[in-house]
Amino acid sequence: MKKIITGIAAFALAAMVFAESTLPAFAMNKSYTYNYDYWGDVQNSPDFYSVQNVYTTTELGLDKPMKTPQGLYAFGDSLYVCDTGNNRIIELSRGESGTLSVVRYIDEFKGDLEVTTFSSPTDVAISEEGDMYIADKGNARILKLDKDLNYVMQFNIPVDASIEENTTFQPNKLAIDTAGRVYCVATGINKGLIKYEPDGTFSQFLGATEVSYNFLEYLKKRFATQAQREKMVSFVPTEYDNIYMDYEGFIYACIGSVKEEDLKAGTVNAVRRLNMMGQDILVRNGEFPVYGDIYMGNGGGVTGPSRFTDVTCFDNDVYVCLDKNRGRLFGYDDQGELVFAFGGNGNHDGYFRQPTAIEHIGTDLYVLDGLSCSITVFATTEFGQYVYDAMEQFDKGEYDASEQSWIKAKELNGNYNLAYIGIGRALLRQEKYKEAMEYFELKYDADNYSKAYKQYRKIWIEENIGLIVLVIVLVFLVPLGIGKVRSIKREIDMADIFRV
């Protein structure tokens, strides 16, 4: 009996060990991409992106390990990494096969300055002419160098009455436009983006965030003593975490330090798109707000809302926000609809320990991890490529081709709302209004359904105008005819009476 029990126990133990050994492999192969349906329920999705490669110090063959890298910038087929802890910038080149290789290490420049090295550079940008702009945070300056690393000029702390004299200038993130104007996010300066003219002069603060406050807290502060006020939280604008200049010259700006209640109340936006007046022109017509995960509960030891630490935008107007809280990437289209969401915290490929920056070359995504000191490269899957093809074809006016691409995407993911809406929009442009209405109805798209219905009704009226006129005429003439017959009948009846 004991032998039987021992055998059963051994078999069970072996089964458990086998299960444990196979579970991680299953988890690794399982899709970690998701979206939301109309009701807000999470819907698993085929992967939109897959990991193409992960580059660490070893894979890149660096002379020494990266140390707390903070910035990433793509220019053509070149990728620039701010190796912040090593006080340098690494220039990488992408080969034909997509592999990255080191071009040079940039740790000093030529010029008649006392300090010609960097101290904790946190961001970099390259102009069309090849000039390099560097947020040299530790040296309290923004540098402009030519393509041969000759010093051109520097941008210093703004001279403005709103900035205290003892403020240390800490440029953190920057962007440049085609005219050579510089936009900077500086730690400790919450007036908005610092805008410099091409000659280095401070121009203005741009796009300061709205101040959100609790009315009860406001009343408390209004009637509090000076000592009590000093202990209370001040109602001040929130600093931006990062900025990105898109191909049209608009600035995407993200805010990581957001509160759940402010996001849900709509008093704060996690990402904005600023025009040259500093106005937020980001379209938010999506089913859900543009702030990452719509559920903010505790999971895996992480709680609170998504905290966007960087953003990048493709030429097809899809912009991707990087969440440093849960290590996820959220892609949105130009209407604010969620295109994809994927990622997570961890050590596996496609997961992150401390995502710091995001960039793109074509539609490939590059994510810099400041803790693991690695660059993860993502390429579109078949599903993702169908979606991008459909968007591009629609923008070119190739509506039939766009419809077919959306159909292929739908075949791979029958729960993908955008595919149904995309098919409907393509049919709408092809003037197939009745079919378009059917697709919009399936996904409860009332706005587009209304557009299709109005056109369908208009055409139906035009095609049946003769019948409509006939019915209207009959509606009016038949009662008149019946009345006339009755009148004649009464006259006849009266005539018969008088004859009698």
State each model region's role.
Residues K2-I8, F383, S402:
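Generic alpha-helix initiation/capping and coil-helix boundary signal
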Residues L23-Y433, K443-Y444, S450-V500:
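Eukaryotic scaffold repeat domains enriched in small/polar residues
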Residues K3-A25, V475-G481:
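Sec-dependent N-terminal signal peptides of Gram-positive bacterial secreted proteins and lipoproteins
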